[in-house]
Amino acid sequence: FKAIRNTDYAGNFDDFLDAVEKEAPFCFWLGTSEPHRAYENGAGKRTGKDPAKVIVPSIFPDNAIVRSDILDYYVEVEHFDLMVQRAIASLEKRGHLDNTIVVVTSDHGMPFPRAKASLYDWGSRVPLAIRWPRGIRNPGRDVKDFVHLSDLAPTFIEAAGADVPSMMTASSLMKIFSGQKMNDRDAAYIAMERHDGCREGGKGYPCRAVRTQDYLYIYNFEPGRWPSGSPDPRVCARSIPFGEIDTSPTKSFMMESRMEHGIAHLAELSFGMRPAEELYDLKKDPEQLANVAGLIEYSAIQHARRRQLFDHLKKTHDPRVVGGKVEW
């Protein structure tokens, strides 16, 4: 595939394991470029994937361009899967697999409009699969508790038998590994400052969110700034309009068709300005298309989620809340 790098990530892991002394502890991060953009146009269909079987998220128009773009994305995800498969096989061949914590995850959501570089589910919810036969009871469980990727740091520290520093605000997953139900894992707290420098002065778009089972509440600290980057490509480090969103066939189509009926609303959600507060009722609106902040019937929920978020930000000493005037 033209867009997939020729880096042999799994082969690099093999070389690393060859250099590790016998019985010595090790840590390795296998980070691939895939599925970062750009993709080979038409790669998905070329591998026999059927566009008709694609489940198109409601945040995108449903047409042949978008379906093909998603299939091309799948090709690169499968390449990552292949590298992970080979790495796991290497651990098994060397007898390390059962005593190694294997974590498979991602740093953000899919590189599409209103996904990556946003606090909506398509931007912040990522896969997380953990394998550790000697440390996880009842393996194969589908755990519904909210976790953060920052929880991995105290988890690794505790698994190694060391004390977790009190300054860490994240929580170890070891109790989940042991099968305990965690009553305090009923929400996820999400933060973003910027992706690329795509606004005047290189400024970001600071926002914070709390995600519960039923609601997503977002607070945008600078609603006067363009959330997806300025429409003026001259102020973007990548010289593209709305540069927080990676260039793609989906983005191009939505920009070119943003005045058309049925697409204008989706384009506004992806590229337009956003209010200071956003609230989404996930039972009625799982893909977060209708902001109900400001509606009378949701005022109590909005107030409660705002207080929940800001209590957490104060507790964790977020500089946007406790640091005085912030210049960036």
Identify the residue ranges that each predicted region occupies.
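CheY-like receiver
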Residues: 12, 16-19, 176
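Polar, glycine-rich mid-to-C-terminal structural blocks
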Residues: 171-176, 184-193, 203
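Short, flexible loop/turn segments with low-complexity composition
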Residues: 170, 318-328
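Short, acidic/polar N-cap/turn motifs at the starts of alpha helices
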Residues: 206-207
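Basic phosphate/pyrophosphate-binding loop/patch that engages nucleotide-derived ligands
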Residues: 21, 178-183
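Extracellular glycoside hydrolase catalytic/binding regions
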Residues: 5-6, 188-198
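Active-site-proximal cap/lid insertion segments
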Residues: 1-4, 17-168, 203, 216, ...
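Short hydrophobic-aromatic micro-motifs
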Residues: 211, 216-219
